[in-house]
Amino acid sequence: MMSDERYMWRAIDLARRAELQAVCPNPRVGAVLVWQDRVIGEGYHRKCGEGHAEVNCLDSVAPEDEPKIPDSTLYVTLEPCSHQGRTPSCARMLISRGIRRVVVGCLDPNPLVSGRGISLLCQSGIEVSAGCLEEECRQVARVFLTNQEQGRPYIILKWAESADHFLDRLRQSPEERPVAFSTPHTRMLVHRLRSRCSGIVVGRRTLELDRPSLTNRYWPLSPYSPKRFLLSSQEVDLEPGWELLRSVSPESMSYLLMENVTSLLVEGGAETLRAFLEADLWDEIYVEQVPDVTLGEGVKAPSLDALTPDRELVRDGHHLYRYRRWA
């Protein structure tokens, strides 16, 4: 139904407002309550441990509209939870409020839910429609779904390169400065990306040559900075605030998820990036290419010839490519 899709798009837009690091390990979820083709309530999950989207949606209903709730339709991007966690079961809350119809975007693969939320609603006599804009709803919850379905963080690779596909000149010491590719604007975009990830990893050579802070200081709108990891199979005397990641493997990624790293940003260097590509452990790749800079030789960037970007932007004369496995 076209009207169902219209209201589900609104729920998706609400879900996108959520700060990823505020809700993790929970998903981003949005909800809209509609009575006779009029929106009477909206909400989204804002922070882990606080009200879910369905609760916030119904709490937003004006007092004069509360009698309309039993005759309304709720649109929610993810299946309502059926279990008692930090917050009460949303499915049972909807049953208690007498909601007539619920339209669900996608199912929740969490073993504690996984169809149970919809079953509870149906058993109580609520009409349930599932799969409305399913792929779009899965997209907005992609970090959570990757955690649940693949048992690892959502992994993003990022690098900047010259027009002839080099990451940097060959350097031997920190005194030799790296080639500066990023503009103030693209640097801000990188720091915004950092703020959305709960972990960030670099290789040993990057740490030794660049001593990166890996904060999101150029994106002050978010208070979240990722947990820092060094990829090294050898013992390293790390400064406080760093942790060691010994390998790139499904097992090591599962370990990160158990350490509450729900999304991981891989910033380099070349060997570290290739390790994730060769292990086929990635979900998104961002490449900043500077068309007016050629190096001729140096540290070669990973090859993505077999992949096709799903988005290309131009900012300050730089080409920004995104490769994404999720639709």
For the regions a language model picked out, list residue spans one by one.
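Flexible, polar/acidic helix-loop-strand segments at domain edges
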Residues: 141-152
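A residue-level detector for well-ordered beta-strand positions
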Residues: 31-32, 159
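A structural motif shared across PLP-dependent enzymes of the aminotransferase-like
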Residues: 23-24, 28, 49-52
